[in-house]
Amino acid sequence: MFRQDALENRKMKWQGRAILLPGIPLWLIMLGSIVFITAFLMFIIVGTYSRRVNVSGEVTTWPRAVNIYSGVQGFVVRQFVHEGQLIKKGDPVYLIDISKSTRSGIVTDNHRRDIENQLVRVDNIISRLEESKKITLDTLEKQRLQYTDAFRRSSDIIQRAEEGIKIMKNNMENYRNYQAKGLINKDQLTNQVALYYQQQNNLLSLSGQNEQNALQITTLESQIQTQAADFDNRIYQMELQRYELQKELVNTDVEGEIIIRALTDGKVDSLSVTVGQMVNTGDSLLQVIPENIENYYLILWVPNDAVPYISAGDKVNIRYEAFPAEKFGQFSATVKTISRTPASTQEMLTYKGAPQNTPGASVPWYKVIAMPEKQIIRYDEKYLPLENGMKAESTLFLEKRRIYQWMLSPFYDMKHSATGPLND
């Protein structure tokens, strides 16, 4: 009764009735298999699938928001703008003090004071030179005028003397005729001849004096030109020295205080430093956004294996990090421009959402600009605008193939790996 076989037999005994159902007909199984195989073949032959890739990016505007950095090290001593203020290109933003101090005071102030004193002395020297030039040239001009008057008077006297000598010469010739006719004696003729030659000698003396006056006029004119040129050269040398001092004064200002100016028109979005704060070279000072933003754009970074399949006008799906897809869904955008050269590292560093290349795994990235169709997102009776720098993820739709082609793609790889050298 307690044998093992009896116990096993008791366990295997059925407790109820067995109902045998009729089997599925063969023709139904065949029909179902044919329908399934036909549908599967139609699906893989007719159906298509687009390869897609997810890339990162961020929202921006054109022109972009401008970050102004400090080019010097110093202390902020004055702030000219406030957040939200509209500014124009060239407007002052910050005043930074970069001067150094010693026991004798501020170095730049002392240097500036010395240069200003030198400039005052140089200006005084130039003024005295100009005054001396005027006095010297006026004196020489007066002498020239005096000699000119003397030359004119002596010329008039010589002209009248020449006329008188001509008359005396005629009288002498008449006396010769009178003496030949016996009307006068020889002594009278001799007196007349002596008087004529005496007047001739006087004329020669007047001519010599007249020539001396003309020569003196020429000498004075030459002195006027020489003295003027000499004074001009000396004044020019002093002006050059003043110009060098002025340049040195400008350099002193550069070493004392630096004014940071706006580089573009726009609105001050944020100020990074306050008065009294120390800044180093490369520190961010403020951000300026465009005054009127017409459109927001999406900057996408696409790897090199995807960029050949993208063209302007393609649609892409966008998911904003600020607007989760679980709540807001995906948004549509249109590709506007595609760069055909890889973006440089310096350019990518200016975008916070750009991918970072790791050492040993450098990937060429191409910049693609897309325009979202919705610039403002409506949610719960509110309008939520896009903002600069918002991170986003986009799905790009690349090449489109039949499903069977995607299924056979591993065999294409095997074919390429087994192919020998190509002979073009």
Swiss-Prot record:
Residues in compartment: Periplasmic: 47-424
Keyword ATP-binding: no
Stored Gene3D superfamilies: 2.40.50.100
Signal peptide limits: none
Subcellular location: Cell inner membrane
Keyword NAD: no
Cytoplasmic side: 1-25
Example of a GO cellular component annotation carried by this entry: plasma membrane
Transmembrane domains' residue ranges: 26-46
Membrane topology: Single-pass membrane protein
Any Pfam family: HlyD_3
InterPro entries linked: CusB-like_dom_1, MFP, Secretion_HlyD_CS
GO BP field: bacteriocin transport; protein secretion; transmembrane transport
Keywords (A to Z) from UniProt: Bacteriocin transport, Cell inner membrane, Cell membrane, Membrane, Protein transport, Transmembrane, Transmembrane helix, Transport
PROSITE patterns: HLYD_FAMILY
Family (UniProt): Belongs to the membrane fusion protein (MFP) (TC 8.A.1) family.
Function: Probably involved, in conjunction with MchF, in the secretion of microcin H47.
PANTHER family associated with the record: EXPORTED PROTEIN (PTHR30386:SF28), MEMBRANE FUSION SUBUNIT OF EMRAB-TOLC MULTIDRUG EFFLUX PUMP (PTHR30386)
Annotated protein name in UniProt: Microcin H47 secretion protein MchE
Originating species: Escherichia coli
